[in-house]
Amino acid sequence: MKKILLLLAMLGFLYAEDGVKKVVFDLTTGDTKVFKQKVLSGISNQKSYYEGKLEELKVAVVIHGDAYKFFIKDLDNSPYKKDTALVKESQEIEQRLATLAKNNNVEFLMCESGMKHNNIDKTTLYNYVKITPNATIGLIDKQSEGYVYIPIKD
């Protein structure tokens, strides 16, 4: 047992980068208030905190559940076209997401399996959204790279 624990600790050190923290958010919420608080504001605040400590925070967000709607640029050609509250806020959401992707290097990974299930075409997504075969694979991959898991749900 001690050998297994020692091996796991050594593997953790292999993935750890000096001064770099890593987090993967498991984003499933469709609640706009929660999304804005935890993703749009929360990630910026967390990045600023670690920058103030002269440390880097790498962030990945795995998108599935009810969260697809926040990452679609063409709502008129999506299952969310009748969500008037979302349509009204979509421009602000897109600008803030683009800032997170571009200026803060946040990686957004969307579940392809759920996209197919919800009839969401890749061409309707923002260009900074990457596709992962499914949410579980995206989460496993990031956790295998040393990312800490945090869920964001309703």
What are these regions (language model features)?
Residues 17-154:
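Secreted/extracellular ectodomain signature
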Residues 4-13:
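Sec-dependent N-terminal signal peptides
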